[in-house]
A protein has these predicted regions:
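Acyl-donor (CoA/ACP) binding surface of acyl/acetyltransferases
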Residues: 1-32, 67-189
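Hydrophobic residues in alpha-helical segments
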Residues: 28, 37, 59-61
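A short helix-loop-beta-strand connector motif used in the catalytic cores of GNAT acetyltransferases and
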Residues: 55-69
Length: 189
């Protein structure tokens, strides 16, 4: 599909392209982004070029990964957010916030907007969030966006060649008062 642009009260969410390579490269020099995400480390200019010129457009073109740069109206990059399709109707959300823009709710705002879009326009019925145990900032964003924490997966992610435990949470359309595309029958306890 062709990339879409979403707007919130404070942000413009759009696919990044070659014009954003330098901003992506600069943001990814932050030690916290390198520590808690699976980007290459060290993060080189060619990694940013590959991301903005190949990975992002290819993900949109083959409907496998929908990546949004989070921008202020003036054009400043405040973060990145993507939804990777992992099975029919199920996507996994991932995000990071640029160091100088953290703590202002931008990533949470974007996560809710992209979740609404995924549920209504992409027929997603479940969004999963995962983060390495200890990444309390990512967990706080997910919780503020409405994700339900479901537990800890042992050896649930691979970061820089090392298996690590991760937290997992989910967001369903009903959590945002939206209909699902498929019936959902919760377990009876």
């Amino acid at each position: 599909m062709e990339p879409v642009t979403l707007t919130t009260d404070r942000l413009v969410l759009r696919a990044v392209g070659p014009q954003d390579t330098e901003a992506v490269y600069a943001a990814c020099q932050d030690a916290d982004i390198r520590r808690w995400t699976t980007i290459p480390s060290p993060y080189l200019p060619e990694h940013a070029r590959g991301f903005t010129e190949q990975m992002v457009p290819d993900g949109w073109a083959n409907d496998s990964m929908f990546t949004f740069g989070l921008f202020l109206p003036a054009g400043d990059l405040v973060g990145m957010l993507g939804v990777t399709m992992i099975s029919l109707g199920v996507g996994e959300i991932g995000f990071w916030g640029a160091k100088e823009h953290r703590g202002r709710g931008h990533v949470t705002e974007a996560a809710v907007a992209v979740a609404r879009w995924a549920f209504t326009d992409r027929a997603v019925d479940r969004l999963e969030w995962r983060a390495e145990v200890g990444n309390t900032a990512s967990r706080a964003v997910a919780q503020r966006a409405g994700f339900t924490m479901e537990g800890t997966l042992r050896s649930g992610i691979n970061n820089q060649g090392t298996r690590r435990d991760c937290w997992i949470g989910s967001l369903l359309p009903s959590d945002l008062s939206l209909p699902s595309t498929s019936p959902y029958l919760p377990a009876q306890t």
